[in-house]
Amino acid sequence: MFRAQQNAFDDAVAKATDENLTSENWEYILDVCDKVAAEESGAKDAVAALIKRLAHRNANVQLYTLELGNALAQNCGPKIHRELASRSFTDALLRLANDRNTHQQVKAKILERMQEWTEMFASNPDFGIMEQAYMKLKTQNPNLQPPSKPGKREITEADRQKEEEELQMALALSIREKPSTAPHPQAESSASAAAAATTPTGAASAGQAQPAASQAVPSGTSAATVSRVRALFDFQPSEPGELQFRKGDVIAVLESVYKDWWKGSLRGQTGIFPLNYVEKLPDPTVEELQREAQMEAEVFGQIKNVEKLLTLLSTRSSEPNVQDNEEITALYHSTLAIRPKLIELIGKYSQKKDEFTQLNEKFIKARRDYEALLEASMSHPAQPQYGRPGQPQYPYPGPGAPMGYPPGGPQPDQRYFSPRPQGHMYPPTSQSPGPRNHTPPAAAPYQQAPSHPPAQPQQHTAPDAYPPQHHRPESTYDHPQELSTSVYDSPVEQRPPYPGAQIPAAIHQHFQQQQQQQQDYSPSVYSPDESKPPGTQQVPYPATPAANQPPPMHQPPPVPGAAAAPTPYPVNAPGASYQAYKPPQGGPASNPASFYQ
C-alpha cells in the first residue's frame, strides 16, 4: 500500500548491469541511452536507477554501473549531465569509494570516471559539484591516483649495448636449458633457475613468481628479457603513437623505445606505454603449464554432465518438485563449480582468437601487397640492353679529322660522298640565294653529259645520312662526286641535304633495299664548274632525276661537224686515276643540235 513508486528504468538498468555478464553489453547500454533521450524525465529516473545499482555488493555490478553512467554522459546531452553532477549522485560515489569493503579496482574506476566527468562539465559552472567531489576524493585517497607518466628520454648507446648483452645471455641460458627438459628430478629446479636468470627481481621458484609479478617493472630492466607485462592501471594515450590499455590487460613487449617507455602490442594495436603502469609477467613454468592443462581437462570433462543435466531437466519438467531428485541435484552442483573456470577459459581463448584473426589479416594484407608489386614488375619488364646501336651522323668531319672509316671500324656496304677539304664547310648566307631558287650564272660553261644516255632512266631515292664507308677520288675543285648515277645529274645540287634526323623513313628503307640489289657501280666523272667561285657552292645531295633539273641558260659548246661524233665522255676504270674533262675541238659554226642526237 505504501510501497515506493516503481521506476521505469530499473529493469533496463538492471539488465545492462547484470552481475552474470562477462563484459559490458553495449546493446543493453544503448537501449538505456535511447530510452533516456525519448522520455522527458528519463535523465532523472535513469540516475536514480544508477544510484540503486551502486549500492549493490557485487563488484561487477558496480563497474558496469559506472560504465553505463559514462555512456549516458557521452550520448544524452546536458540533461543527464545535470543529474550526474547532482548532490545525490556524487554523494553515492563518495560513499562507495570510502567504503573499506569496496574492491580496489572499483575505487580506481570511480576516481577515473569522476576525473573524466569533471573535464567534460568544466565549461558549465552549474556543474561544479562534480569537480568538488573529485578533489575531495583525490585528497582522501591519494593512493588511487595512477602515477604520472615518465618523460620520454632517448636510449643511450650504453643502454642499447646492455640490452644486447642481456639478450645474448638470455639466449644462451635458453639453449643451455634444452637438455634439462627431459623428465628427471632436476626439471623443476632448472625451470626455476631459468626464471630467476631472466627475472632481475629474483623470483627463484614458481611459488615466488606470483609475488614477483605484483611488482612494477624496474627502471633498469630491458625489453630483451621481458616478453609480457600486465597493466596495473588504465592508460589513456595523450599523444599519437601511445598504446591504450585497461587494468589487467596483458601486453606483448616488442622493443625498447625510450628510457622508461616500451613498445608493445595489444588487440592488434601497436604503440608505446610507460613502464610504471605495468608489471612484469615471467614466462610460465612447466608446473604452471601442467596446472593450466589439467584445469582445461576438468572443464571439458564436465561437458557430458552438463548435457546429461539438460536431458534430465527436459524429460522431467512435469514433476512438481525437482529438489527431491538426488541425481539432478548432484549434477547441478558439479557443473556449477566449473563456471568460474569456464569463464576464465572463454576470456583466454577469446583473446587468442582475436590475436590469430589479426595475425591472419596482417598476413593477407602483406600477401596482397607482395602480389601487387609482383604484377607491377611483370607488367613493366626492364628494357633489354642489346639491340642495334644508333649510328652517329658524320656529314662532314671536323678540322683535322682523318679521312676514311668513321670511328669504330668499317660499316656495312654503304657508299658515301667524299668529304670536302678544310675550308668552306657551308656556303656564306650573305652571298648565296635560297637553295630552291638558285640558278647557275649565265657565264658558267655547260657541262657535257655522257655520249650514250641510258635507255630508261632509273629513279633514285635519297640515301640515308649514315656515315660513308669507302673513299673515292676527289674532284680537282673539291666538289664531291656522285656514285651509282645513270642519268644526267648536276654535280652541284641546288638544295641543302636533309639533316640526319629528318630523312623520311620510307626513303631510308628504299635506299637500303636498292643498295642490296646493286652490287657493282661505275662512278661517273663530271667536269667541275670552273667559273664559279668556291664560296658560292651549295652542299651537294645525291642523285636526283634529270627531269627535275632546270634547263641550261647558256650556249652549248660547238660541234666540229655533222659527221663527226662527239668525243665520248671518259669513264674511269676501277683503280684508274682521275681524268679531267676536255671539251671537244670544234669551230664556232658547228651545229649544237647534233650533240643531242
Swiss-Prot record:
Sequence segments annotated as region (Disordered): 140-164, 178-218, 380-597
Domain SH3: 224-283
Domain VHS positions: 16-145
Biased amino acid composition, Pro residues: 392-410, 548-560
Taxonomic classification: Eukaryota, Fungi, Dikarya, Ascomycota, Pezizomycotina
Extent of Basic and acidic residues compositional bias: 151-163, 471-481
Keyword set includes Secreted: no
Gene Ontology biological process terms in this record: protein transport to vacuole involved in ubiquitin-dependent protein catabolic process via the multivesicular body sorting pathway
Function recorded in the entry: Component of the ESCRT-0 complex which is the sorting receptor for ubiquitinated cargo proteins at the multivesicular body (MVB).
Keyword field: Endosome, Membrane, Protein transport, SH3 domain, Transport
GO MF annotation terms: phosphatidylinositol binding; ubiquitin binding
Main subcellular localisation: membrane
Annotated protein name in UniProt: Class E vacuolar protein-sorting machinery protein hse1
Biased composition (Low complexity): 189-218, 381-391, 440-450
GN (gene name): hse1
